[in-house]
């Protein structure tokens, strides 16, 4: 059983600065870290490894120079995966969901897999698209929002996911892609033994060419900026008549 758990390196949000002049975001002092939502996917994959005999867990990520960081690689491997594959290329530096999913799908095909796990979204964009797109590109079953994994056999994964007023139990034929929610587990903090052992685990570094990736984006991100700050108007409308309601609605329209 080959399980791939995908993760993304994202800037530590507490170190992101805002340029007051134009609202642009300054990431220069923000260290990269594992996306919080992907920690749940890594933990879920390693828990499955304990249930399935001879299962192997491979952590997989695509990105730019952040993936060259040895500390970041050790952090991932200390959480339980048996090996790490990183696909590093300049074109993935600010990759959008479609590009990321295409690269992950190509890398997963090259590595081989029975099951792919990922978080519901990423800590930076939280587009909630990548997992679904990977399944679509690979033309295999894909389920998102999974809050519990019930069982795993050689050909079926049984899971639960919470809906608004009910709980679904789904049997998914393998191979498949599953995006897990934060309710599925509480990621463990790696022990010192696990951290030291992470340095001995294998790491494969691939490029876009190694996975046959040569996508052309139909659109590209031009700028990321914080919303402009506006002073509070402090408009007080007294009364509950039709005129006051109309005045309230008019002021509301101005700020929407």
Swiss-Prot record:
It comes from the Bacteria. Pathway: Amine and polyamine metabolism; carnitine metabolism. One of its GO terms (biological process) is carnitine metabolic process. Required for anaerobic carnitine reduction. May bring reductant to CaiA. Heterodimer of FixA and FixB. SMART domains: ETF. Transmembrane segments: none annotated. GO terms for molecular function: electron transfer activity. Belongs to the ETF beta-subunit/FixA family. CDD domains: ETF_beta. Keywords: Electron transport, Transport. The keyword Isomerase does not apply. This is Protein FixA. InterPro entries: ET-Flavoprotein_bsu_CS, ETF_a/b_N, ETF_b, ETF_beta_N, FixA, Rossmann-like_a/b/a_fold. The keyword Cell membrane does not apply. Pfam families: ETF (PF01012).
């Amino acid at each position: 059983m080959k399980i791939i758990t995908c993760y993304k390196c994202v800037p530590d949000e507490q170190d992101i600065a805002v340029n007051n002049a134009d609202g642009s975001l300054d990431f220069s002092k923000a260290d990269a870290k594992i996306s919080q939502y992907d920690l749940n996917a890594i933990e879920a994959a390693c828990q499955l490894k304990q249930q399935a005999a001879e299962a192997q867990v491979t952590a997989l990520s695509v990105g730019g120079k952040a993936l060259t960081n040895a500390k970041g690689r050790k952090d991932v491997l200390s959480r339980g995966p048996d090996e790490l594959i990183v696909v590093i290329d300049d074109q993935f530096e600010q990759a959008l969901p479609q590009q990321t999913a295409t690269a992950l799908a190509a890398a997963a095909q090259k590595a081989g897999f029975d099951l792919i796990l990922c978080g519901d979204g990423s800590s930076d964009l939280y587009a909630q698209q990548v997992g679904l797109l990977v399944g679509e590109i690979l033309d295999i079953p894909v389920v998102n929002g999974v809050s519990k994994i019930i069982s795993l056999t050689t050909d079926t994964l049984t899971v639960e996911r919470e809906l608004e007023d009910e709980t679904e139990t789904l049997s998914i034929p393998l191979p498949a892609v599953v995006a897990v929610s934060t309710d599925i587990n509480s990621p463990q903090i790696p022990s010192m033994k696990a951290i030291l052992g992470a340095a001995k685990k294998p790491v494969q570094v691939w490029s876009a060419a190694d996975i046959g990736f040569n996508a052309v984006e139909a659109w590209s991100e031009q700028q990321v900026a914080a919303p402009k700050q506006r002073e509070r108007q402090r408009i007080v409308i007294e009364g509950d008549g039709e005129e006051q309601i109309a005045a309230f609605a008019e002021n509301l329209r101005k700020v929407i």
